């Protein structure tokens, strides 16, 4: 299951006035890794996406989200993967890495 959220860019003049709670509300990404879910946050800062994927005993498929306006997630994007857990496999077009 893929869950996603959207973040607007903040005005630099406004950010200078944010208190701790406001900074956390606008910039902190919580619950990035949830078992058997794909968590994505689409940010208007350079239109980048931060995501966490934690497969536990099953495969998860990275699918497009509405903000991308494309059939596949990587139609117009590149992807970097950092494994911070145990051993894992990424399958792309039937090839396992």
Where does each model-flagged region fall?
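Glycine- and acidic-residue-biased ligand/ion/polar-headgroup-sensing regions
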Residues: 42-60, 68-97
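A short, N-terminal "cap"/entry segment at the start of jelly-roll beta-barrel domains
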Residues: 1-52
């Amino acid at each position: 299951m893929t869950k996603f959220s959207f973040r607007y860019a903040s005005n630099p003049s406004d950010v200078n006035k944010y208190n701790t709670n406001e900074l956390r509300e606008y910039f902190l990404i919580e619950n990035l890794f949830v078992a058997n879910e794909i968590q994505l946050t689409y940010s208007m800062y350079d239109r980048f996406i931060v995501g966490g994927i934690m497969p536990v005993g099953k495969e998860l498929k990275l699918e497009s989200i509405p903000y991308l306006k494309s059939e596949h997630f990587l139609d117009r994007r590149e992807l970097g993967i950092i494994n911070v857990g145990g051993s894992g496999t990424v399958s792309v077009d039937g090839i396992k890495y």
